[in-house]
Amino acid sequence: MFNKVVLVGNLTRDIEMRYAQSGSAIGASAIAVTRRFTANGEKREETCFIDISFYGRTAEVANQYLTKGSKVLIEGRLRFEQWSDQNGQNRSKHSIQVENMEMLGNSNAPQQGGNFGNNSFSNNNYSGNYENQSYDPYMSENQNFNKAKANPAPQRNQSPQHEEKLKEIDIDAYDSDDTNLPF
């Protein structure tokens, strides 16, 4: 099964860092994602708050450069977490395990921690295996996918006139309402 999530939003709190017994960094935070739309001629907003977790070097970079309110693009996978609370009640939630992130600078606001502009960072196939993690039935599938990504098929030489150029997307240009979307 395909499990990929891409979100752009702002952190709702600073990164909370922990370290596994193996020394691997684990970072936790949450992201607020706002959807703007028009309903019955009235402009409305709907904000969703999602817990996110970073692992390895990505956690360290996120902790160093991101603070509450930082705008970030994250790419990762959806996880379903289950536990028992102090009263013995079964609890659950969905969260995102971040695999790649891009720090998005906001030109309208001063940035804390230095001007990092638009920078991306990847876990470099870090699997997030740390102590007390339950069995992940998709891990072998993800490892095979990561091996395929690490060893891409050879590509033919193409002349520059046939290469597609990726255009940068101004995310803020799409924040007005759904009628401006290109699809």
Curated annotation (Swiss-Prot):
GO cellular component terms, A-Z: nucleoid
Pfam families (UniProt xref): SSB
Domain SSB: 1-105
Family matches, as InterPro entries: NA-bd_OB-fold, Primosome_PriB/ssb, ssDNA-bd
Composition skew (Basic and acidic residues), residue ranges: 161-170
Entry keyword set: DNA-binding
Annotated Low complexity bias: 111-135
Region (Disordered): 108-183
Residue ranges with Acidic residues bias: 171-183
Gene Ontology molecular function terms on file: single-stranded DNA binding
Keyword Transferase listed: no
GO terms of biological process kind: DNA replication
NCBIfam families: PRK08486.1, ssb
Subunit text: Homotetramer.
Protein name: Single-stranded DNA-binding protein
Native source species: Campylobacter jejuni subsp. jejuni serotype O:2 (strain ATCC 700819 / NCTC 11168)
Biological classification of the source: Bacteria, Pseudomonadati, Campylobacterota, Epsilonproteobacteria, Campylobacterales
